[in-house]
Amino acid sequence: MNRKNFVKFAGFGTAVAAIGGMAGCINRTATNLAPASVKGARVKKAVYVPKGRNRFKEELMIWGVIPLQIKVSGKDTNGAFFAFEHANMSKGGPPRHLHYEQDEMFYAMEGEFAFEVGDEKFVLRPGDTLFAPRMVPHVWAYVGDKPGTLLIAIQPAGSFEEFIIKSCALKEPPTPQEAEKSFAAYGMKVVGPPLAVS
């Protein structure tokens, strides 16, 4: 084999080895990113929830004041994921808290929301997304002048959906002591008051 052909062959061999190595890395990475236990969704078909509707069709209001619509139930995902929408929100929000075992994602659909995650402050406007990792204290409040809408996703679902349903059974906001007890019963800890909103 002459030098020119050897260089071409060596270059081709190096490229093949690199691609093979990358494929192996990609395969290992995908495997590492897969959930530890994937049992599949509980439902075996698509779940469609129209705008303005709740997954299970009933009207829900947290503490009798915050409209809520379940979009994806933990029952749909075998507990892997839960998503809900706060629509037509007025000013205010929950107390500062943390989740022991769940990450939370917020997506602003309408209006303006103030957030604090750890020591960082954010303002979410339509189209903005914010991720709050488990074990990091966070608080948020709707601060807009017109009604707002916020989509929230919880991963894994855990008992958060049950917390939401129990909160919807209450007709008025809980006292700070009642909120602490309720949050604690569902894997969360209240660590401060709600954000002040003018």
Predicted regions and their residues:
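N-terminal export signals
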Residues: N2-R28
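C-terminal segment of N-terminal export signals and the immediately downstream linker at the start
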Residues: M22-W63, A169
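A short glycine-rich, His/Asp/Glu-containing loop-to-beta-strand
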Residues: L60-R96
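Short, conserved beta-strand element in jelly-roll/cupin
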Residues: A87, Y100-F115
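Histidine-centered catalytic micro-motifs
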Residues: P95-E101, V139
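Short acidic-glycine-tyrosine-enriched beta hairpin
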Residues: E120-R134
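Ligand-binding loop in jelly-roll beta-barrel domains
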Residues: R134-F160
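Acidic/histidine-enriched, glycine/proline-rich intrinsically disordered or flexible terminal extensions
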Residues: S167-S198
